[in-house]
From Swiss-Prot:
Superkingdom assignment: Eukaryota
Gene this chain is encoded by: verU3
Source organism of the structure: Penicillium polonicum
Region (Disordered) location: 18-45
Protein name: Verrucosidin biosynthesis cluster protein U3
Positions with biased composition (Basic and acidic residues): 18-33
Record-linked InterPro entries: Verrucosidin_biosynth-assoc
Amino acid sequence: MTNILRLFALVPGSVEQDAERISDRRDRSHEEGMTNPEAQSVLNDAEFGRVDPTGWFPHYKNCVQHFVDYSQHTPQVQSIAAFINIRLPCQRPSESSAPMSESTPSSFVSLRPYIRRLIVTAQDSPTVMQGFFGGDWEAGVGCIYKQERVNYMFTAKSSGWASTKAAYDISPDEETPFLRPLRDPSEDEIRVAEARWSEWLAMEDWMVGARSPW
């Protein structure tokens, strides 16, 4: 009976502590949004979450075409893909015996899994990105590249090593062989991630719409 009473005595304090923690986090998010003059401009950065489809998509298609028709067949790209344990489109099983260009149109190939794997293994140097996706890679996949680098920071911040690795594994046999810290992050890139993280904390506490600190 004494133990039960002690347990009940602890519950109100726990609830109060949780409420204080949530309140503190809300205040912190609000203060960061209001005191950081760069937060508003960062959160309004159109390049991070939105693109002009008419201007961006032709460049993206160029990158897909380069990857499917040319770079995936080069020894350099094949060796990197083997090292980071990800199959190229030409290495994936197909139900059709027709050539890749006929059986799997380039428009059906997603570049995002390759960008993600290059980032988490720190193989995403400009030289490698150009080797995979062509000279137009910054205009074509640059926005995806920025998104996924921030996503990697978020994943590492919100979970441990095993969970982070699992998030980037591709079933059944293309597991991420290793994880490396983000390659050469700039101060601006870190500030963008910090602002986005504060925005996410606000979302967790329903500080959106009229309640948003920004």
